Amino acid sequence: MKIFTQKVKKLIERKDFQVLTKLLSENPNLANKGITIPFDFFCRQKKHPLHRICDAIFARKISDDDGIIFAKIFLENGAKIDGNKINGGGTPILAAASLHAEKLGIFYIESGADIHYTYQDNGETALHWASFCGRDKLVDRLIRSGAEIDGQDKTYNSTPLGWAIHSLQSNDTVNKF
């Protein structure tokens, strides 16, 4: 099985959508099998493929648009939109929000991601992270989708607005900030 999970990572790195589609259709269990970060030779920690797509976008190795294509392939072949949530792990929407994968985060919401989930019950939601990272389009979509705007995290006892005010460091010209 390890050879297949390494192959999934390599197919993401090569942006080989067709071969990945074929591999996952023949081995659908791989759609939820953890992989290390694409393009990173030192990473040893495995996470859900929908999470790792966000890592590749953050590293600017793939575009948001390519990330959406990859996510569609994984989802069409049985990937769980909430990744390893059932095991207490982070979810792909949390990864997208915290790793500046704005378009992909919106796609995850449209695909049914749990926008209310907090990692390890610490109160930090996708809205907290999108606010901190200055992702106004993702913040807007989360709010329009019913995300709790007054929820406080347990570490800083702060709302998403508090996180946004704290960071105010986004130099991203695509965002309104």
Set out the residue ranges of the language-model regions:
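Ankyrin repeat domain, specifically the short helix-to-loop turn at the C-terminus of the second helix
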Residues: 24-30, 70-80, 106-114, 140-148
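Start-of-repeat signature of ankyrin repeats
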Residues: 46, 88-89, 122-123, 156-157
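N-terminal segments that cap or nucleate solenoid repeat domains
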Residues: 1-49
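Ankyrin repeat boundary signal
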Residues: 32-34, 83-85, 115-119, 149-153
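Ankyrin-repeat and related helical/solenoid repeat scaffolds used for protein-protein interactions
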Residues: 137-140, 144, 149-177
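Ankyrin repeat A-helix N-terminal signature
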Residues: 10-15, 44, 52-65, 95-101, ...
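Eukaryote-skewed repeat-based solenoidal scaffolds used as protein-protein interaction platforms
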Residues: 87, 94-100, 118, 124, ...
